[in-house]
Design a protein with these regions (language model features):
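Flexible, gly/pro- and Lys/Arg-enriched active-site loops
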Residues: 4-38, 43-159, 164-167, 185-191
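Intrinsically disordered, low-complexity proline-rich tandem-repeat tracts
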Residues: 172-177
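Acidic, low-complexity intrinsically disordered tails
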Residues: 178-186
Length: 191
């Protein structure tokens, strides 16, 4: 799985169920990466899209607890495990906040547009720069669109440190339990 988002300098992704900024290059990148693919989103994200419909030229899967919810051009699922099975490993997580938090541990790569401005958000993406489980893989040059400076950044899961793989000194290796064979096998054979 992959995640894709645009974040402000505080890792904000939205306010009042709308994007914080509209940057043409970000929208083109989103389209190029997700078109023809499966996208997974929450109900509020779907409702924030034009006409509240699934994105064109994509398979849209919407995770919601509302059993009565229906939407055009979208498959509705009600459980995270159902979403994973329906979406498959090549799905793109596109929001919102709770969906990112829930599925980020399953992602192999995260594609972010980092915008160097404060969008006064009320919804946030996890701060990957402060998370030891993620590391920057690639960064574009800093670009500008209508006075907004931004950068494309890709994150990948961090490789575990060697120390993470070793037992600490307080935890000596444990010997496997030793089992003595029973002296009388008749209890096992039914005789």
């Amino acid at each position: 799985m992959y995640a894709i988002a645009a974040v402000d300098q505080n890792w904000g992704i939205g306010r009042d169920n709308a994007l914080l900024f509209h940057i043409s290059a970000d929208m083109k990148r989103f389209r190029a990466l997700t078109e023809g693919k499966t996208v997974l989103m929450g109900r509020k994200t779907l409702q924030s899209l034009p006409n509240g419909r699934g994105l064109p030229h994509r398979r849209n899967i919407v995770l919601t607890g509302d059993r009565d919810f229906a939407a055009e051009n979208a498959e509705i699922v009600h459980f995270p495990v159902e979403a994973v099975f329906q979406a498959g490993e090549d799905a793109w997580i596109i929001g919102g906040e709770s969906v990112y938090r829930r599925f980020l541990p399953l992602c192999d790569r995260v594609y972010l547009t980092k915008i160097f401005a404060d969008g006064h958000a009320d919804a946030f993406f996890p701060d990957l720069d402060s998370d030891p489980h993620w590391q920057v893989d690639t960064e574009s040059e800093i670009m500008e669109d209508n006075g907004l400076r931004y950068q494309f950044v890709e994150y990948v899961p961090a490789a575990p440190e060697e120390d993470d793989l070793l037992l600490s000194e307080e935890e000596p290796p444990q010997e496997p339990p030793q089992f003595a064979p029973p002296a009388d096998f008749s209890v096992f054979s039914g005789f």
